């Protein structure tokens, strides 16, 4: 009853958890169901366990995911094993910390589209149009401070190991573009166009651009792709996304840079 009272009147509720254990796997679907029943847009952000955590934990996570999908409007999945695929020498304790940081950035990337004013601001209705009853979703993140930072940041986000799926049939995408005050509207529009070219022409794309002076000369792109199929096909990113020929940065280098920024 106390939890129900806390959720009453909320417009949007994030339920974050690590699936596979007892606490998150058992409680997250219940909380999500209560939040949705209270009328809130309910978005779950869940990590799937590392293979090193064992088969039983993996099976528990899959069962919990099915319950979570039926309870929440949208479930954003963060597959922990993808971190180790591209950085197999990453210590497991650091991998858990990176996974938690990604989960936090996923929530922050969505909420800042509403809460922070910027070049292009969104409201709750915009978020709901993408996240409401959209099923499965995944997230990609990228950033760059190069001379072609806009295209490089979106390329990195789309080729992120966390977004290792075919997004061509996704029903929607939420794009958060952040940069310092020298970021231009033209750069933001280039990022959105690259994402649009990867999706179905009928997909609903909502984007916002925020000013964050702590990023200095860097542009950070966060993409949440919703309404995806559950196939495991890789999302192919080609060099045609760049106006000029660019040397592709390996996923391992991208992850190393990301980890360096966290620790």
Predicted regions: what they are:
Residues 1-263:
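Tubulin/FtsZ superfamily GTPase core signature
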